[in-house]
Amino acid sequence: VGSEMCIRDSAYIVPCIEAMDGFDQHNPWHIYDVWEHTAAVVENTPAYPLVRWAALFHDAGKPDTFLIGADNLGHMPNHPIASVHHMRESAKTLHFSKKMQHDLDLVIRYHGDRPEPTTKSVRKLYALVEHNEDLFHAICDLMRGDARGKSTRATKWIQKINAAESLFNEMLKQGEVLSPADLPVNGTDLISLGVPQGPHVGLVLSELFSAVANEEVAPEREALLALARRFMQS
């Protein structure tokens, strides 16, 4: 109730929130209307500004994107993008810094991702939030709150988020490759192989990291150098 009252107060300065009030999602997975769901998500996220604001805006785009599918259920395709748009429109009124807008954009835009507790999935989500450790934890916080605000059947999904976040923490602790900067090869190594200095180096490093992230090559120095040589020959 407290969160819902706060949201109602916020509607005076964030008009897009009014459209969520009483908006039926027409889907058994969602036991609340969009307004009630948003209030539940706000209440079920940790009390720090980034994730609380993200919770407030994360579904603001649902009324804009709503449609009834062939299954006679409600669907909101690409609603996170519409939600980001509403956040950007309100940013000036709310005096969000450019950094806050940037961080909110990423957390809202990708909150519907479904990470699995696998290294491949963790690397993917970490890349989506631009290899920012704080944003990885923030998006996990929002995902948990979002799940709790959807249905009482969300326990399994929350367990997966927790497991993925635990795996991320363990990968950090073990110094595993989570971003291009973590690769056991660098620009100097690639130049020594004959890669031209300049943007080509960054492109090859990105390709090497993609290969590691997709588990196409082991994150080991010699294996990566061999792959870089193949890139140069192709």
Where are these regions (language model features)?
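Divalent metal-dependent catalytic cores for phosphoryl transfer on phosphate-bearing substrates
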Residues: 39-162
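Active-site flanking loop/helix segments enriched in acidic
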Residues: 14-40, 61-73
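Short acidic alpha-helix initiation/capping motifs at coil-to-helix transition points
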Residues: 30-33, 78-85, 116-117, 178-186, ...
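Charged substrate- and nucleic-acid-binding regions of tRNA-handling and nucleotidyl-transfer enzymes
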Residues: 89-93, 150-234
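Core structural elements
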Residues: 11-12, 113, 184, 195
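Short, well-structured alpha-helical segments
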Residues: 14, 101-109, 201-206
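Short, small-residue-biased leader/transition segments that mark boundaries at the very start
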Residues: 1-7
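Residue-level recognition of specific faces of alpha-helices
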Residues: 16, 138-141, 189
